[in-house]
Amino acid sequence: MNKNKREKEFYSVDVGDSTFTVLKRYQNLRPIGSGAQGIVCSAYDHNLERNVAIKKLSRPFQNQTHAKRAYRELVLMKYVNHKNIICLLNVFTSQKTLDEFQDVYLVMELMDANLCQVIQMELDHERLSYLLYQMLCGIKHLHSAGIIHRDLKPSNIVVKSDCTLKILDFGLARTAATGLLMTPYVVTRYYRAPEVILGMGYQANVDIWSVGCILAEMVRHKILFPGRDYIDQWNKVIEQLGTPTQEFMMKLNQSVRTYVENRPRYTGYSFEKLFPDVLFPADSEHNKLKASQARDLLSKMLVIDASKRISVEEALQHPYINVWYDPAEVEAPPPVITDKQLDEREHTVEEWKELIYKEVLDWEERMKNGAIRGQPSPLGAAVINGSPQPSSSSSINDVSSMSTEPTVASDTDSSLEASAGPLSCCR
């Protein structure tokens, strides 16, 4: 595309303290969130005739860490396609050459709220269970491709008013390697698993601990382990769950084990004490959707020793979850990530920049050739035709699917923040 023609396709608009230079198909830009990794606007896409979210990555080439994170997020979003994962609709830059290349824009589905807002609502068991089911379906899809999200938290999980749920933000997601000691500083502190806090390395069910913390927060309407730092976070965990066994202690390196063993010992509380019936909604007409089953699921997710913690596959078979089980959603074909060295690769900033530029050009070429039409495929659709709609009844058949919206970036990631009001289906 020649320079003049490309320039005519874009226009610039100030959004807060930033300038967005976007394709003219995107109009009515309005800021909805910002954070360490990006600024997010809602916009109207005249080509698709729908509202979308546009995320401008903040200074993606300022250092190797930012550049690698931007590359990882873009590659994973391009290839992951599931109804419970946020759908990438477009990728573009206004710059015309690699030398000029500085800005990356990701266009995604626009959702109505993030889970931070939903947590404050009184949900019945149907909605609570169904939200968890969709969360686990999305995580299972990632895990099936060897991808651990590593940053699950309420602001990274978004919903639509029809109760469709989607998972956001792959800036910190990485491919898994059995036995690999992975980087300890990842997820927002409150949702960090013990193995992360203690620098033990981790595997896929590190995401299950985060889901357990989120479920507990939805039940209690407050953060389960609100630690101020690593040490306080660990103390918050053992004060409630109890000091772990000697078997677990022996898995720690010597210096960490010495510290942990010298802390006061706690017996912890039973899950009946931590999550009494009064915190839960009234039992559903469905005999599996009741406080005792939700509490049992919590007790299997919030296990300090990861080797004894439930897996995502096991969680999906739990009675509180499997009432929704649909093989098409749970067993969707895994994404094919062509770059198997996604995490092991190390490059200079300029090399990362060139790789990202090639990914953007590849997207543009596929769009031009009709391989991408700017619409999510059926598995990535925001609303699935024929999905059940929630009503005032508490019957198991009354809850619909869910969807997401960009959320504000946290202190460790590039998530987006929703600006919309509460879910009508959860009122």
Curated annotation (Swiss-Prot):
Residues 404-417 have a biased composition (Polar residues). Its cofactor is Mg(2+). The keyword Ion transport does not apply. The active site is at residue 151. Its EC number is 2.7.11.24. It holds the Pfam family Pkinase. InterPro entries: Kinase-like_dom_sf, MAP_kinase, MAP_kinase_CS, MAPK_JNK, Prot_kinase_dom, Ser/Thr_kinase_AS. Residues 26-321 form the Protein kinase domain. The modification Phosphothreonine is found at residue 183. Activated by threonine and tyrosine phosphorylation. The modification Phosphotyrosine is found at residue 185. Coiled coil: none annotated. Residues 372-427 are annotated as: Disordered. Dually phosphorylated on Thr-183 and Tyr-185, which activates the enzyme. Keywords: ATP-binding, Biological rhythms, Kinase, Nucleotide-binding, Phosphoprotein, Serine/threonine-protein kinase, Transferase. ATP binds at residues 33-38, 55. It catalyses: L-seryl-[protein] + ATP = O-phospho-L-seryl-[protein] + ADP + H(+); L-threonyl-[protein] + ATP = O-phospho-L-threonyl-[protein] + ADP + H(+). GO terms for molecular function: ATP binding; MAP kinase activity; protein serine kinase activity; protein serine/threonine kinase activity. Expressed in brain and ovary. A motif (TXY) lies at residues 183-185. Residues 387-403 have a biased composition (Low complexity). GO terms for biological process: positive regulation of NLRP3 inflammasome complex assembly; rhythmic process. The TXY motif contains the threonine and tyrosine residues whose phosphorylation activates the MAP kinases. Responds to activation by environmental stress and pro-inflammatory cytokines by phosphorylating a number of transcription factors, primarily components of AP-1 such as c-Jun and ATF2 and thus regulates AP-1 transcriptional activity. May play a role in the regulation of the circadian clock. Belongs to the protein kinase superfamily. CMGC Ser/Thr protein kinase family. MAP kinase subfamily. This is Mitogen-activated protein kinase 8A. It comes from Cyprinus carpio (Common carp). The gene is mapk8a.
